[in-house]
């Protein structure tokens, strides 16, 4: 049954990825699958969280890629899934770059699709652009409109390029739009057109493929889209051909012992990690639908699955400012006000750091303030 395949694939991912890191394989999608499945392993999630903090601090910016904001969106999805706060990752707010709609859409339709998904995972407020910015402020309406405007003429659906609906991009767009399906007639009509366009491409074996090859990832994204729309990927007649459902088609790529193949090569299947992660979170999405839970990306039910490290916070890269005013040394200790910032986050004395003054009594000395991370 799909449940057994799901259980063993969760274990396969956990055993294969000993430590998840920021990345499109072995990273956020694996974390998403395990976290939304309800797999408990605080050490594993904590290692991932600490890796994200290190990664962001090494870049030294809240923009994880110079141009593509899908990196930010993907990490926001991973962090939210484990109950972490994407607005303070080692002192950086990963939501902030998504406030600039021009930057979000720079890479094409993928940008707004994943920005909308990421923002909705935690129902996050979109940060405001600075007053002096000439860029377009991102809003949910703006993201939805951008996606709707990119719908293909004719039969509908979406694609990165060309005039034929692409299964992956179309079903990803549907996943982004799904929360607005019932409330917005324009969204509903576009989603219905897209889901029909993709159904028309489904092959006799129930399979789906971008670029003419049936592959498990295209099936996986379609299953996620159907689950988000509260439609059953195993019985929904629009997605059953010759008694083969889209779920059957994806499960045909399963490999005993856990794991999924990308596509059959010379009739043989071999485990592919990206395919395994996508198929597994698609099964999580399907299982959540079957058991009446919130959708894969509606994380209003999230729990904190990791533990914040008890190790001391390093403040060596923090900016320490001492209020500068003429102090006259008269034999009593002087303690000017001190501000400590990490990235763009103001740190709190007694929570993040302690301070100690030295040489601050007698004139002629160089007074010093020492900030120590807690």
Question: What are these model-derived regions, one by one?
Answer:
Residues 211, 321-324, 357:
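Surface-exposed, proline-enriched loop/turn segments that connect beta strands in immunoglobulin-like
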Residues 16-42, 62-87, 104-140, 152-192, ...:
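An alpha-helical repeat/solenoid feature that recognizes helix-turn-helix modules
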Residues 49, 91-95, 140, 144, ...:
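Core helices of alpha-solenoid repeat scaffolds
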Residues 158, 208, 329, 338-340, ...:
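Fold-core signature of tandem repeat domains
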Residues 342-374:
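Serine/threonine-rich, repeat-prone extracellular segments and beta-strand-based repeat modules
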Residues 310-345:
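Solvent-exposed, low-complexity, repeat-rich "mucin-like" stalks and linkers
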Residues 1-8, 249, 262-311:
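Terminal, non-catalytic domain-edge segments
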């Amino acid at each position: 049954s799909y449940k057994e395949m799901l259980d063993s694939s969760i274990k396969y991912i956990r055993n294969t990825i000993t430590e998840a890191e920021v990345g499109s394989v072995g990273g956020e999608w694996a974390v998403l699958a395990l976290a939304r499945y309800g797999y408990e392993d605080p050490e594993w999630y904590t290692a991932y969280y600490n890796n994200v903090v290190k990664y962001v601090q090494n870049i030294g910016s809240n923009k994880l890629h110079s141009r593509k904001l899908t990196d930010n969106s993907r990490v926001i999805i991973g962090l939210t899934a484990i109950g972490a706060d994407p607005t303070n990752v080692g002192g950086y707010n990963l939501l902030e770059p998504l406030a600039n709609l021009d930057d979000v859409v720079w890479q094409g339709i993928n940008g707004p699709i994943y920005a909308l998904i990421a923002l909705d995972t935690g129902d996050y407020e979109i940060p405001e652009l600075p007053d002096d910015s000439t860029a377009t402020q991102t809003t949910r309406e703006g993201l939805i409109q951008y996606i709707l405007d990119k719908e293909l003429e004719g039969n509908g659906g979406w694609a990165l390029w060309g005039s034929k609906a692409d299964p992956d991009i179309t079903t990803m767009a549907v996943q982004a739009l799904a929360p607005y399906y019932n409330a917005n007639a324009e969204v509903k009509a576009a989603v219905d057109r897209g889901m029909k366009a993709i159904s028309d491409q489904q092959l006799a074996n129930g399979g789906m493929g971008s670029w003419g090859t049936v592959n498990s990832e295209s099936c996986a994204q379609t299953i996620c889209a159907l689950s988000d729309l509260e439609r059953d990927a195993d019985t929904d007649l629009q997605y059953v051909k010759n008694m083969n459902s889209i779920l059957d088609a994806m499960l045909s790529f399963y490999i005993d012992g856990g794991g999924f193949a990308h596509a059959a090569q010379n009739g043989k299947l071999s485990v592919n990690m990206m395919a395994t992660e996508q198929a597994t979170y698609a099964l999580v999405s399907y299982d959540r639908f079957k058991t009446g839970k919130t959708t894969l990306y509606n994380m209003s039910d999230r729990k904190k699955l990791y533990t914040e490290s008890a190790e001391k916070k390093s403040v060596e890269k923090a900016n320490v400012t001492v209020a500068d005013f003429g102090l006259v040394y008269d034999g009593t200790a002087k303690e000017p006000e001190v501000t400590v910032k990490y990235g763009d986050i103001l740190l709190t004395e007694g929570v993040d750091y302690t301070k100690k003054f030295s040489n601050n009594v007698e004139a002629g000395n160089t007074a010093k303030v020492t900030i120590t991370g807690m």
